[in-house]
Amino acid sequence: MLTLKIAVYIVVAFFVTIFIFGFLSNDPARNPGRRDLE
């Protein structure tokens, strides 16, 4: 039961981190580094 709760917290933290990174990357400019990578 404890490992299940830890796994749930890890998954939630993972999605929250992805959401925060996506929001920060889209906030200042619209895709600033994509043309440099291509």
UniProtKB/Swiss-Prot annotation:
Q: Which GO terms describe its biological process?
A: photosynthesis
Give the location in the cell.
Answer: Cellular thylakoid membrane
For this UniProt entry, which segments traverse the membrane?
A: 4-24
What the entry lists under InterPro entries is as follows: PSII_PsbI, PSII_PsbI_sf
Which Pfam families does the record associate with it? PsbI
CC annotations in GO:
photosystem II reaction center; plasma membrane-derived thylakoid membrane
Kindly give the membrane topology term recorded for this protein: Single-pass membrane protein
Q: Which domain of life is it from?
A: Bacteria
Q: Tell me which UniProt keywords the record has, alphabetically.
A: Membrane, Photosynthesis, Photosystem II, Reaction center, Thylakoid, Transmembrane, Transmembrane helix
Q: Per its UniProt record, what NCBIfam families does this chain match?
A: PRK02655.1
Q: What does the function comment of this entry state? A: One of the components of the core complex of photosystem II (PSII), required for its stability and/or assembly. PSII is a light-driven water:plastoquinone oxidoreductase that uses light energy to abstract electrons from H(2)O, generating O(2) and a proton gradient subsequently used for ATP formation. It consists of a core antenna complex that captures photons, and an electron transfer chain that converts photonic excitation into a charge separation.
Tell me which family the UniProt entry assigns to this protein: Belongs to the PsbI family.
* HAMAP family named among the record's database cross-references: PSII_PsbI
Assembly and oligomerization: PSII is composed of 1 copy each of membrane proteins PsbA, PsbB, PsbC, PsbD, PsbE, PsbF, PsbH, PsbI, PsbJ, PsbK, PsbL, PsbM, PsbT, PsbX, PsbY, PsbZ, Psb30/Ycf12, peripheral proteins PsbO, CyanoQ (PsbQ), PsbU, PsbV and a large number of cofactors. It forms dimeric complexes.
Know the name of this protein?
A: Photosystem II reaction center protein I
- The species this protein belongs to is Nostoc punctiforme (strain ATCC 29133 / PCC 73102)
Q: Which gene encodes it?
A: psbI
